[in-house]
Amino acid sequence: MADQIWRYAELGYLEQKSSKLLQEFLVKQNFDVRRGVDGIDTAFVATAGSGLPTIAILAEFDALPGLSQKAVPYREPMESGGSGHACGHHLFGAASVAAGAR
């Protein structure tokens, strides 16, 4: 998932493909997914189980403008001037949803 989110490199509030990817994974893991939370198309809340304790996990998966980069150890943009992941949100988002996997 992290590699796919890296390739999507979608800016904040525009992460349609990334959000869909994460939500589909959670549904396959038997989570109930509520989409479009607080009027934000890409925001979602996924729940599973009941009772206590309640555990909440935040997943961020937005990219930053102007930082397009192929997954190589030297500067090589995927798209000149495009967006990219420079602070690990592709990993953060994927790991956050994977933390709830069964």
Kindly give the residue locations of the regions a language model identified.
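Flexible, small-residue-rich helix->loop connector segments that border functional cores
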Residues: 98-102
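Acidic/His- and Gly-rich active-site-bordering loop/insert found
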Residues: 1-85, 90, 94-97
